[in-house]
Amino acid sequence: MAIIFMVSPWGLVYAQQTTKAPTPAIGDNGNLATDDLLIARPPAILSAEAHAGRPYGIGRINYRLQPGDEMIARTGAVLITEANQRISFPVIADTPFREFLGNFLRSNPSNSADTKSIWFLFKGDQPLNVTLHGSGQSTLDVPIVFDKPNRYERFAKNWWNSFSSASDDMIESGDYPPMVETYLTALIGKRLGLATPKQILRSKDALARTFELLFDVEALRIEAINKAMTVGVDQDLATLPMPPKIQWTPLVVENLPEDIVIEPLAQAVPHECFYLRFGTWKNQIWLQQLTEEFGGNLSRMIQLRGYQPKIQSKFLDQLAIQSSEFDRLFGGSLIDDVGVIGMDSYFDNGAAIGVMLHAKNTKALSSNMRSKRKKFAAKHADENATITTITTDADETIELLSTPDNRYRSFYAVAGDNHLLTTSRRVAERFLESARGIGSLANTREFQFARYQMPVERDDTLFIYLPTRFFQQLLTPEYQIELRRRNQVVTDMVLYEMAKLLAAGESYDFKSIDDLINGGYLPIRFGSHPEGSTFETIGDYWQCSLRGRRGFFTPVADMKIERVTLDEQRWFTQRADFFSNNIKSLDPMMIAVKRYKQEDKFERIVFDAQVLPLGEDKYKWLVQRMGPPLKQEVRRAPEDIVRFEASVQGGLLGATAQTHHLFGAVQDYLDPDIDLKPKSFLRLLDTFRQTPGYVGAWPNAGLTNWMPQLGGQPDAFGYTYSRLLKLWRLQWEDFSVLSFDQRRLEALKQHLAIIPSPRPAQVRIKVGDLANSKIQVWANMLNFRRSWQASIANIQLLNLINQQFGTPPEQTRSVASRMLDVELVCSLDGQYKRLRLPMGRNVWYSDAWPSFGNPVLPKGYLAPVLTWFRGLELEVIKEDTQFSLHGILDVQRSEQADALPSFDLFKGFGELFEK
């Protein structure tokens, strides 16, 4: 049954029942999240009004979903349609009062019983025939108001604020790159002359800007989309000379002994490459098996992500070596050492990276390597795979196995007993030069100092070294400008995809890119690239004319750049000035990891990291916040299971803050009244309130003195209280401690004391075995809430594509995958499916979701981190001229840890040794 709501010219709403027969629902698989949706529940329409305007009118409908439609509300599956397709860019928002409550008081931001507003734009002056879809649907006629310009302006402001805020919320909660939200807000803002949302314009501090420049984070592409749609694209051709390089202060290392041992593998590593050394074959097998336990991605040890690459281990797959079980059994008989080197880490779009092998028998390894590569090329002949030989200026040879689109790009070079498989010709050439002693990492004073600090004799399981020249190379004009150009190419691919979708959804007739530009869907001069590159679709993937297939671009190191545009010249000069004024030198970094086998399936992993000789001025952002090393510690309470301590320098939050010892803990005791139900959202204040712990300072109040309500005179027992936050403060002797539970503070009094510490440190963290603790259920629930939220965010994206672009639900997932170049996956390890509602509409859900109305933690759910994590100790100290980090991690391996892995961290060295 549907209900028709009629709106009279005077704004009165009345209902009329219709007899439209519902479409029977397809049988559900018994998933609790969808059980309630087998019954059609029409949304209750509370009010509606629409105001005429140009180029768009603006309307609003206030409605309420019925109980049972919680999943519809939470996933953004409420849909609004108009009989003549006149509605555009709808957005759902809380009423202003509800929004205030949601931010500060309520726990559930999307209760189906709450009153919601759906704002929308429309074209034309005739009354609107609108249908609002929940699990059921309600249809209403909305007359147009022409004579209230002030109300129109207020509606326009509310619609834009709601639209941009909704985009901000999706960006905050989602795991995926927010390209769709960025495009829509930029396009609409430009159409209507509205300000860009705060999330996109949010300024970045120096550290964030440095990180983005070095590691090509997704934020650069998001900024490129916004810039293209609001400012336009660079229209000039590259005719100007390259801007000068950044002038770095040289790193000086003195007084080194002459007898420092350097491993043979490092002799052939270029001094501008990062270097990851396993040392032995069994060490890479250990990491390989650890990776296999978590589906080929170590990040899944902490939390399942909401997306995954279309091709796992992209660069290793690109190297075109197949694997067998020989890896584990016989690899060590021919391989003496294993390493990974690279000039960058741009895995998403073509990294200059390679795998090094130090052979025990070079002739046997080389023979088998070449044989397997020939077989691979023959097997992939239909992809035009070929093997060619390249002769260098030094008359050395490099073998290249490749396909025209770069899907496979594997250079093979041999220098003595060192072998290299790499995606980059430049890395291969530098490998051969380094083996001859030209620019070898082993010959640099900084690496020798690193080996003096962390000698080869330590027999580390992993040794990672990032030299100064590695960072400097990433910040050369050649690297940065090419990185900017390829980001623009990828941005254009995504923009073109979204523009076609939106134009089709708005029934705009287009046949070419020029049509889309003229319609405002693409920026003027779209597709103009300084180097003259173009792009096209081939099958189901994008390809750049100069760089190859998206995701497998020719590495930056292999691109030749000689001329730049004026905009590029200015852009790099600004960044060079930033470093000249803020960071005059870049320091090497090194990390060492060693594992120790414990009883049964337990392992202890000890790790050390150092940032070597440094100039303190470039770390002022950190140094100014770190106080002197702590030679004492706060006595541990028996219930503490997670503890942290930090020396905090005055000035962190204000000039009045004094240097103090900050400490806190999560305790192994739960309030029996705590709400541990699964929730499909995660609010920071709610999380703090439910955390069974405390935060304190000594010998002065320090950061605990941040609220005026808590800074008053304490009562006779030392307490003050904030009614707004429901937060207690204990002032006891020289301690000031905050907690949401007064009983916890009272029990803590007897343990508050300062005792000597075994070692000085500025930061200490200690975490016990959460999986076998009393708060396991709390930690598990916290992880579930975050994962559920990320899983829902993916479906919100699909619903956004459906609503804003008019893409049918059955196509939205493939469209999202194509645009983002990732596969959207459920972060609860479920499967995304479609459910046909009683009225015939399809909606997306995950079969791992519990009921939204009355959620219960799924039986057997255990957060990924709780399956293996058994403890952590971490210390950080800055003393004299270096930062040092020391940690101990206790791990429980799975029962399959000793089995042969089917996923190969370094695809496939085993088959190299088969006859």
Model-found features: residue ranges?
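Conserved hydrophobic/amphipathic alpha-helical signal-anchor segments
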Residues: 772-817
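Short cationic amphipathic helices and targeting signals
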Residues: 349-358, 417-422, 663, 686-709, ...
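Structural boundary/hinge residues at secondary-structure and domain interfaces
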Residues: 21-90, 154-156, 160-353, 357-389, ...
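Periplasmic/extracellular, small/polar-rich flexible segments of pilin-like filament-forming proteins
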Residues: 815-886
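Bacterial N-terminal signal peptides
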Residues: 1-9
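A cross-kingdom feature marking solvent-exposed beta-strand/loop segments within repeated
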Residues: 325, 378-412, 439-449, 707-730
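A conserved glycine-rich beta-strand in the N-terminal activation segment of trypsin-fold
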Residues: 407-478, 482, 719-775
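Boundary at the C-terminal end of the N-terminal hydrophobic targeting segment
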Residues: 13-15
